[in-house]
């Protein structure tokens, strides 16, 4: 099989108790091995991305690319699904374990759901977390969320990350370097509120 796109995931948090937890260095070695294997098969993707493509795009569907790279709004469908727009996030009913029958009886997935209006910095945190899957962030998308220049808002953080080779900057794009990917949790958290 040679699918058009490949995605590499770490174990989800609900699976962590079933398997031994690898160190950051072990996960980095595992990713490096997979990266070399996947790119050796002809797939394209920057080091630090978890999506790869034979066609040389981001390896994402247009929906995911809009959501992850362009800070697009999205509507989650289904019980406990998350939705996001330019003012906040919301969760459909069912996240606290209501039965499917109970949820269907309500005739909507919005009634009884949780909605949160978020300040720009918290919305930015969501964008950073989502775009981190691709190992890159767009400063123009960040500016749209913050309503101010992220180069000024995060001047110290960007200076530190660039000067220490954790990220690279190309136009409005920020890319994790291999060194930054090794510490991606710490790198991304510098942009959280």
Where do the PLM segments sit?
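Basic, amphipathic "hinge/linker" alpha-helix immediately C-terminal to the N-terminal HTH DNA-binding motif
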Residues: 120, 174-181
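Short, amphipathic alpha-helical interaction segments positioned at domain boundaries
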Residues: 181-193
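Short amphipathic alpha-helical interaction segments
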Residues: 148-162
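Short, Lys/Arg-rich nucleic-acid/phosphate-binding segment
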Residues: 50-52, 171-174
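A short, conserved structural fragment
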Residues: 162-172
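C-terminal scaffold of the Radical SAM
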Residues: 1-148
């Amino acid at each position: 099989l040679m699918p058009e796109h490949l995605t590499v995931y770490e174990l989800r948090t609900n699976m962590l108790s079933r398997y031994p937890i690898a160190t950051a260095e072990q996960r980095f070695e595992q990713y490096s091995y997979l990266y070399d294997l996947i790119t050796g098969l002809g797939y394209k993707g920057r080091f630090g991305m978890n999506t790869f493509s034979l066609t040389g795009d981001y390896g994402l569907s247009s929906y995911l690319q809009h959501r992850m790279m362009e800070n697009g709004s999205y509507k989650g469908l289904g019980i406990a699904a998350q939705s996001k727009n330019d003012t906040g996030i919301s969760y459909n009913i069912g996240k606290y374990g209501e039965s499917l029958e109970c949820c269907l009886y309500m005739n909507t997935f919005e009634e009884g759901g949780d909605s949160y209006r978020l300040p720009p910095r918290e919305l930015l945190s969501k964008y950073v977390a989502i775009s981190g899957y691709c190992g890159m962030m767009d400063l123009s998308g960040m500016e749209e969320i913050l309503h101010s220049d992220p180069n000024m808002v995060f001047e110290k953080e960007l200076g530190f990350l660039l000067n220490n080779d954790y990220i690279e900057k190309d136009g409005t794009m920020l890319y994790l370097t291999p060194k930054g990917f090794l510490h991606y949790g710490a790198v991304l958290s510098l942009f959280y509120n």
